[in-house]
């Protein structure tokens, strides 16, 4: 029986320049002799979508376009079907299906990563009925599509909604915020921040809160251990929320009695820096860091040195 061939963008495989790039599949074979029933089917992976109405699909026999009612899309499967009369009239003629697809927006491709490369394979097939074989099935070659690897999103930390904070008083409470995005195609994600030893979380659990895509996360996602605060998503959440904005907020202050001499810089100013970080897939090698954010407490006043003699400034 005739082979069935599939290509993408007229090639055996396609490397996309952009994740949202549209690509074109072609499937072709010949109509078998003596077939009493025949269809071509192609089921897209669940991370793909047909692009445009009915995938902008078109089918031809011997170069002549078939009417659209020959083509049906049900979920992820596109099917081209010929009736018995068409089969008899067109035996051994080429039938070709063309349609367009793209990667589904927000799709998590972690299941398609092999050795650091993302590959989405697809395969077409045809089904035919013959007098001696009513359930004949034949598969095409496998056609891979490779999207570009997603870039790591930036992470930004602020204090009191600014890049630095000058405190009015040494014991003043201040608010750290962290903003980033859940990376695409990950199976785990955590944002964390280890505050300097001279700082402490202010209030119960640092009055911490976190949102993803503007929706609050419950407290079980936030943990504080020693000087470190962590906001962590489950595997299902990380997969479902790729590309969504993450916002973390917590409060801190300088510890009472803390010695800040290690934080005095050459210009005489005391600056306490802190950096937020994230990693994904529980892999420390994926860690990304924000710019350091300084908190600047007021310079302590020198204590007055006063000397007296017999309770007086002078004695004669």
Q: Each predicted region: which residue ranges?
A:
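Extracellular/luminal low-complexity Ser/Thr/Pro-rich, glycosylation-prone repeat/linker regions
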Residues: 1-9, 109-114, 118-160, 260-265, ...
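Exposed beta-strand and adjacent loop surfaces of beta-rich binding modules
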Residues: 3, 35-39, 56-58, 154, ...
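Low-complexity, intrinsically disordered segments enriched in Ser/Thr together with acidic residues
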Residues: 26-27, 78-118, 178, 229-270
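A surface/secretory-pathway sequence property marking extracellular, secreted
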Residues: 39-82, 190-233
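Short beta-strand elements of extracellular/lumenal beta-sandwich folds
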Residues: 17-36, 169-187, 192-194, 309, ...
């Amino acid at each position: 029986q005739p082979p069935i061939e599939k290509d993408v963008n007229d090639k055996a495989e396609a490397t996309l320049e952009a994740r949202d790039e549209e690509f074109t599949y072609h499937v072709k074979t010949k109509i078998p002799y003596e077939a009493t029933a025949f269809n071509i089917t192609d089921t897209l992976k669940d991370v793909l979508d047909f692009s445009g109405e009915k995938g902008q699909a078109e089918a031809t026999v011997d170069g002549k376009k078939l009417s659209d009612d020959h083509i049906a899309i049900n979920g992820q499967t596109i099917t081209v079907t010929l009736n018995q009369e068409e089969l008899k009239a067109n035996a051994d003629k080429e039938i070709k299906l063309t349609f367009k697809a793209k990667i589904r927006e927000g799709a998590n491709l972690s299941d398609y990563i092999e050795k650091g490369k993302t590959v989405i394979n697809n395969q077409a097939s045809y089904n035919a009925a013959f007098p001696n074989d009513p359930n004949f099935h034949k598969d095409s070659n496998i056609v891979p599509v490779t999207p570009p690897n997603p870039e790591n999103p930036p992470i930004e930390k602020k204090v009191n909604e600014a890049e630095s904070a000058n405190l009015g008083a040494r014991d003043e409470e201040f608010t750290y915020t962290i903003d980033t995005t859940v990376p695409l195609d990950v199976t785990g994600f955590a944002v964390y921040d280890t505050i300097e030893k001279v700082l402490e979380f202010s209030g119960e659990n640092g009055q911490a809160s976190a949102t993803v895509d503007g929706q609050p996360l419950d407290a079980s996602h936030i943990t504080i251990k020693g000087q470190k605060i962590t906001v962590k998503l489950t595997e299902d959440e990380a997969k479902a929320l790729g590309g969504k904005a993450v916002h973390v907020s917590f409060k801190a202050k300088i510890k009472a009695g803390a010695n800040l001499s290690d934080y005095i810089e050459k210009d005489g100013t005391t600056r306490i820096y802190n950096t937020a970080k994230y990693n994904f897939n529980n892999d420390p090698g994926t860690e990304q860091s924000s710019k350091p954010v300084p908190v600047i407490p007021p310079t302590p006043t020198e204590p007055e040195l006063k000397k007296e003699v017999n309770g007086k400034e002078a004695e004669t």
